[in-house]
Structure formats: C-alpha cells, structure tokens
C-alpha cells in the first residue's frame, strides 16, 4: 500500500478523521477568526486528499483551491462541489496569477519545507490586498531535543531531508521575515491532545499488525528493527504527552 492508497483508504480516513493530524474544530475556528465567508477564495497549501477544502466550502460556502504536494494523492482528493479544485505543485512554484486569493492556509506542511521563508514569500504573492495567512503547525519545545530512537531515525535516514522541526519562535521569525505582520499567535493544545488520543486509539492495532506482519524494515532500506519502530511510536506519544512536541497557530497579514 503506497501513500496514495493509504490516504484514500476509507478505514484509514475514518480512523484518523478530517484534517489529520490537525483538528477540524481548530481549523474551522482559525478560518472563522480570519474572516473566511461565502465570498472568500482559500488557497490550501498542502491539501492532502482534500478533506479540509471540502470542510471549508461546506462550512463557509467559500471557494477553495487545494495544492497537493504528493502527486499520487490527487486521485484520492474529495470532489463533491464545483467550488473546489485541486492540482499538484510545489509550495514555492505555484501556477496562479498573483493576488487572487483572500486567504492562504498552511497546516502541518512547514515541517516538510527546508526554506520556510520562501514558502511564506510565495504565499504573500498569492494574497489580494487585505488577505490573510493562516498557519497551523507542529512545533518542538524550545531547548528540547528529539527522543533517542526517533532522533536516530530522522538523523540517520532520508527523513532528515524531509523533516525540519522548528520552535514556535522560529516559525514566527520566518513569517515576519517574509514581511507579514503577525496579528495573532497562540498554542493549540486541543490539536496536540486530539493527536495523542488518535495515536492511543490505533496503538494496539498498529502494534499487533506490525508484530505479526512479514514487513521487514531492512528490506525497505530502513535500518531499524520492528521493535525500534514500536519504541519510536511510544517515544512520539510520550513527547506529545509531556509537551516536547506541541502545536501552534498564527494569523498574519502582509505589511
């Protein structure tokens, strides 16, 4: 099962829910606070399989355009309304005219971007006058470090090319460097708790499936044992519980 198949699987989507790993309630609250209404056109950078775009048009009656970063996910995007569309593109090379969106939404995608300032500068060009940037991201606590096995997995594999963990202050600085004024910023413990609850729900099933499956991490060029994978899963849960990992949101407008 590749990433597209997993994301499009009804059982996976039912278990994880819309806007995973974020919270749909928090996403809707942030969008409401940003002034999204039936006249808005939202650009969602990193749209996954489109559940958030669908959520927005159903709740606010707006238009939504989702940029999908992983091309195989396009076939699983949720098309249920003519007000929503999706396309595959990089976050820093968007095929749109400038200044045509009222809002740009980024959730849990900054962590995958090595040049975050470039992402925010691109987002700025997409916004019409008076437009708003909404960012909702996982963060690592200042002066904290990754758990032992999880840190090894990221440091010793290609994960270090795609995971760029930042503190809330570091993301805020990148937003400001792109010449945005930060209108509001706050921690989002509801997202962290929801993610922890989801992981607890699937923990036993995942552990049983991994233990009894024929999957061999080494055969996938991933130099860790099943036991270490399970330990990393538990480390991640503990890091959420003790707030080593958290969630933070920003609302910003171009200067």
List where the protein language model places each region:
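Conserved SAM-binding loop and adjacent beta-strand
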Residues: 12-28
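Class I SAM-dependent methyltransferase SAM/SAH-binding core
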Residues: 49-93
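A short acidic, Gly/Pro-enriched loop at the edge of an enzyme's catalytic core
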Residues: 92-104
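A short SAM/SAH-binding and catalytic strip from SAM-dependent methyltransferases
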Residues: 103-116
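A short glycine-rich, Lys/Arg-flanked "PGG" loop and its adjoining helix->strand segment in the class I
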Residues: 117-132
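Conserved class I S-adenosyl-L-methionine
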Residues: 134-156
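Short alpha-helix
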Residues: 163-179
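Conserved Class I S-adenosyl-L-methionine
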Residues: 184-255
């Amino acid at each position: 099962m590749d990433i597209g198949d997993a994301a499009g699987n009804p059982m996976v989507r039912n278990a994880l829910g819309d806007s995973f790993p974020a919270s749909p309630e928090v996403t809707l609250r942030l969008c409401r606070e940003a002034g999204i209404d039936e006249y808005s056109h939202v650009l969602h950078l990193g749209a996954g399989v489109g559940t958030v775009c669908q959520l927005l048009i159903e709740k606010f009656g707006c238009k939504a355009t989702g940029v999908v970063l992983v091309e195989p996910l396009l076939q699983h995007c949720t098309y249920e309304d003519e007000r929503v569309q999706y396309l595959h593109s990089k976050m820093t090379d968007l095929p749109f005219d400038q200044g045509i969106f009222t809002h740009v939404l980024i959730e849990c995608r900054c962590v995958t971007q090595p040049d975050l300032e470039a992402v925010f500068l691109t987002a700025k060009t997409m916004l019409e006058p008076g437009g708003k940037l909404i960012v909702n991201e996982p963060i690592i606590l200042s002066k904290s470090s990754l758990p032992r096995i999880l840190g090894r997995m990221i440091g010793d594999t290609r994960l270090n090319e795609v995971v760029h963990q930042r503190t809330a202050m570091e993301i805020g600085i990148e937003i400001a460097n792109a010449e945005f004024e930060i209108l509001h910023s706050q921690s989002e413990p509801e997202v962290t708790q929801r993610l922890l609850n989801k992981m607890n729900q699937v923990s036993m099933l995942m552990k049983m499936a991994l233990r009894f499956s024929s999957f061999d991490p080494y055969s996938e060029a991933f130099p860790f044992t099943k036991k270490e994978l399970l330990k990393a899963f538990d480390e991640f849960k503990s890091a959420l519980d003790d707030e080593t990992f958290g969630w933070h949101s920003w609302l910003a407008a171009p200067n």
